[in-house]
């Protein structure tokens, strides 16, 4: 069993919790602020997508290959890393087919959101919360294990996931707020959904703690990299394109990749 630093463990839990609670920021935008700028939202979503794709392919997948290589040899390490990456995409693809995509939820501009249709709105809110909660479990695992192994990798990933969680908080808060007219319920529902990330991380860690090894880390990182790339391509970029009014998606994507690339270089120089 691999030794895990207690310092990294607490950092990983804190970072995962912070990323999950970003859903609350989205709900606050609904109940207290004006309608979000769609161009800024498009840029932010694409930025998060670019960051997630970059860190998944350049850092997390490479950590999977390195861990498998430590457990076996270089050829098998590359093979198993690639297979678990593809397995991660297949896994989240199945989940995505079984659970509705949270970014396809109705908005407050939808004609269905009328005062006399609160039962329908309440049902939409419940379905959205369940869908987003299900999607948050693998994101929590990704943030936690990436930070547990290397905070320099996990923190930028958590930042990208936090940006991604803001519109999810909006998606939950809109129907809940319209159905109940209660700000506390809207914010609370979003925060509870976000807590699925640290809960998922805790369950995953407890399940794997006794068997942590190079092979297990390789499997987890391979699956995480596949899941993150699929989520970025299937959820974040299409959602960004939907809000964009120009080239915000491309600019956000490139900015996200560039920012993550520079931050990882700086982390390398900052660590001894």
Swiss-Prot record:
Origin: domain of life: Bacteria
GO molecular function, one term: zinc ion transmembrane transporter activity
UniProt membrane topology term: Multi-pass membrane protein
TM regions (residue ranges): 11-31, 40-60, 76-96, 126-146, 158-178, 189-209, 211-231, 250-270
Compartment(s) where it occurs, according to its Swiss-Prot or TrEMBL record: Cell inner membrane
Binding annotation for Zn(2+): 139, 164, 168
Record keywords, A-Z: Cell inner membrane, Cell membrane, Ion transport, Iron, Membrane, Metal-binding, Transmembrane, Transmembrane helix, Transport, Zinc, Zinc transport
HAMAP family according to UniProt: ZupT
Protein name: Zinc transporter ZupT
């Amino acid at each position: 069993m691999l030794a895990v630093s207690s310092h990294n463990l607490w950092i990983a839990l804190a970072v995962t919790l912070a990323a999950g609670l970003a859903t609350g920021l989205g709900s606050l935008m609904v109940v207290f602020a004006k309608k979000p700028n769609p161009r800024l939202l498009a840029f932010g979503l694409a930025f998060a997508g670019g960051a997630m794709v970059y860190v998944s392919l350049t850092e997390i997948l490479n950590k999977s290959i390195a861990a498998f290589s430590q457990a076996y040899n270089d050829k098998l390490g590359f093979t198993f890393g690639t297979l678990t990456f593809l397995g991660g995409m297949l896994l989240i693809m199945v989940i995505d087919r079984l659970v509705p995509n949270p970014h396809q939820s109705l908005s407050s501009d939808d004609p269905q959101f009328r005062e006399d249709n609160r039962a329908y709105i309440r049902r939409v809110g419940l379905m959205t919360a369940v869908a987003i909660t299900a999607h948050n479990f693998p994101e929590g695992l990704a943030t936690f294990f990436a930070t547990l192994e290397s905070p320099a990798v996990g923190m930028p990933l958590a930042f990208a996931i936090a940006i991604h969680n803001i519109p999810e908080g909006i998606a939950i808060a809109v129907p809940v707020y319209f159905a109940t007219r209660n700000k506390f319920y809207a914010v609370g529902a979003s925060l509870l959904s976000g807590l699925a990330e640290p809960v998922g991380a805790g369950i995953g860690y407890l399940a794997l703690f006794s068997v942590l090894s190079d092979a297990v880390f390789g499997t987890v990182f391979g699956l995480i990299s596949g899941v993150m790339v699929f989520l970025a391509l299937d959820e974040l970029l299409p959602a960004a394109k939907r809000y964009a009014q120009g080239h915000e998606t491309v600019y956000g994507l490139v900015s996200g990749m560039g920012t993550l690339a520079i931050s990882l270089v700086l982390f390398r120089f900052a660590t001894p």
